[in-house]
Amino acid sequence: MTRSRNRKLHKNQRNTIKRGARSGSVARLSVPVASALLACMQATYAADAGNAVGALQEIVVTAQKRTENMQNVPISLQAIDTRQLERLHVSNFDDYVKYLPSVSFQSAGPSFEHTYMRGVASGGDGNHSGSLPSVGMYLDEQPVTTIDGNLNVHIYDIARVESLSGPQGTLYGASSEAGTIRIITNKPDAKKFAAGYDLDVNSVSHGGVGYTGEGYVNLPLAANAAVRLVGWDEKDAGYIDNVHSVIQFPGPNGTTIPFDNAAQVRNHYNDVETRGGRAALRVELNDTWTVTPTVMGQTQTTNGNFAYNPQLGDLQIAHFLPDTVHDSWVQSALTVEGRLNDFDITYAGAYLTRNTHELSDYTDYTLAYDVYYGFNGYGTYFRDNAGNPINPAQQIIGRDHYTKTSNELRISTPKENRARLTAGLFMERQVHNILQDYLVNNGDPLASTGSYDISVPGWPGSIWLTDQQRVDRDQAAFAEFSYDITPKLTGTLGARYYTYDNTLQGFYGFSANYSSHEGVATCFNPNVPWNDAPCEDLNGRSTGSGMTPKVNLTYKIAPEKMVYATFSKGFRPGGVNRNGGGSLPPYKPDYLTNYEVGWKTQWDDNRLRWNGAIFWDKWKDFQFSYLGPNALTIIANAGQAQIKGIETDAEFRATEQLTLSGGFSYLDAKLTQEYCSKAKPTTLCDVSNEQYAPSGEQLPVTPKFKGNLTARYTFPIGSLDAHLQGSAVYVGPRWADLRLLARNLLGQEPSYTLADFAFGVAKDSWHAELYVNNAFDKRAVLDRYSECDVATCGSVAIYNVPNQPRTVGVKFGQSF
């Protein structure tokens, strides 16, 4: 017997319980966003007393690892600051990604989001033993990208979220192939005391009641030192109902084995509880040196499943065994900033530890794959020691432990100089200990029809075990040099030299009594244990080195208007194939080459800000996953693709009371050669090299068009400052999979448009707001999948991942 055992592989061989994204709110466009090129995206704003009346506030970013006005940064960049994050009710990744036009994502639930930018997606990322992400995620100065999904950082007391589109291979390196997202926290301030809190109570249509409590305090300790403490406690209401169902497993001699889920039936069962905090200390050692240690941590418990089965009804699913995830992480970071002569010196180091414990119902997969596919007509294969047939339903017990260490030392010359340099050294090491135990329900011990034990040795009742350690190492030296050729023309040259060394070691598979293809039967030495596994059948290594360049020319048309042209390159490291005990060759890096022209402009005394970029990207030898002859995932370099697109955002202070903001992206992302089942150098599909998709096919996951629009109107009510706000997001149709067979069975995810509204008042130190998210209770399809490979299971049990239903809430807060 063989089957796929790939814990969170997206769409094409999804064989685990997929939890969909808790979307928060998304919004409906009342008119096509494309017609509003100058009506604009989120760039932070506020009228400032020092600015001209009605002017937008300057946006300060650190995207180029130095503090700059965003309008002077020749990068396609969006930033959402503290005020906009609050106004848009952003509390997590799903909330802010809606307002980033070039960003799309897939989700296996909170803490398991997989991010894509500019359409750079093959639909095969997410497996714990597969490709690294193509988008880098940063928390302050530290990378927090993990292969199983992003950290679901609670967004509160955050200075801004920065989204850098396109390859960032010079300053950010590996896994910033298609872009980088940075979460920048508010830092301690020794100049003044500050504190505040916010409370939120909300009700979800078709679901339960949720709440949030958040607070912070900035406490000066001395003239040169301060501490900042932040905490949050949030409960997100569930809205998926686990309904009653009875399934029949085929038994011997035409009989059946019933399985009733009555013990798991519950309404609104996909609730989430999140608690966390942050503590930061900032000490100014003297006039030139500052030390900032920070500790941030969070625990999150997720119940249930975030998808529903349309065949059962709206927001209904039938699962038979518990679904839970407990995710906890702590990041300890240290940033040292100073000056030596005319050089700015920065050291940024961090240590991240993350633990997840998962229980996932595997009944669907058992029914569709293990029974019907493998043993239909043989009665039942699983029996107890007395020879009686048992319920073959399985549950996955998963435990993942991550540690991530990163260190960066860089030097910068003053930004006022005609010649400017940023250079540095970087080191990163990520260790992922993977344990996935596939346990047969009531199978202790497990025996076959031949009355011999088929459990994995040492794991009674476990039909399959994955016990592996993955280590990804990355080292780099980088530099960017800019020179003002004339007062208006600046040239930049950049390069990053990198090396990577990635290993994958351990055990995956069955017992020798159950399979001769994977597991104990293929161990190097079956009598020598590896960790908690019976033996070792995998020990692979992938190494490489290279250089990613960057060339940029920037021209200042006027003090508030500039255009730029960029050539840049990004990469994603290669890795180890598990298949065949590591006998298959490692998969190689893939590369994204970017040609881009962009603009940064301000108009009408800075009442209008309009930025954008047009780009052409070539994705060479992209990594993709497919099922090999033994039904295990293989990662190969066999794809060529190109992405042509435009992304733009703007903000307009139409009047003293009315502000409009928005943005959109249009992407033409498609294959430029056939997508075949075998890796290069074989690129022509034939009978022995099955065609998965023809040249010209649209890449999956990302819509061609995505846009958003926000309008905010302020006015007085007596002594109160009041506001009305409406936000809208449109997402075009997407494919969940690149393969034509899967597309035919799953269908296309339709476009959706939804709306958010808010009314609030404020006076002195307090503010209150009534809001409704997803006001018209539209049911978007954020994701669509089958529990096992559609080529095997067909269209049995297709699941939709919905957005969160209409949510009505009240917020109240104070600041001191």
Language model feature labels by segment:
Residues 1-88, 94-99, 218, 287, ...:
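N-terminal Sec signal peptide and the immediately downstream disordered periplasmic leader
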Residues 93, 114-116, 138, 163, ...:
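N-terminal periplasmic accessory domains that precede
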Residues 127-128, 134-135, 140-165, 213-215:
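Short acidic/polar hinge/loop motifs at secondary-structure boundaries
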Residues 205-303, 328-332, 401-407, 411-428, ...:
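Transmembrane beta-barrel wall of Gram-negative outer-membrane proteins
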Residues 214, 335-363, 556-572, 579, ...:
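Membrane-embedded beta-barrel scaffold of Gram-negative outer-membrane proteins
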Residues 239-268, 303-320, 361-397, 437-467, ...:
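Solvent-exposed loop segments that connect transmembrane elements
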Residues 487-491, 616-618, 637-738, 811-815:
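Gram-negative outer-membrane beta-barrel transporters
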Residues 728-739, 760-816:
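C-terminal beta-signal and adjacent terminal beta-strands/loops
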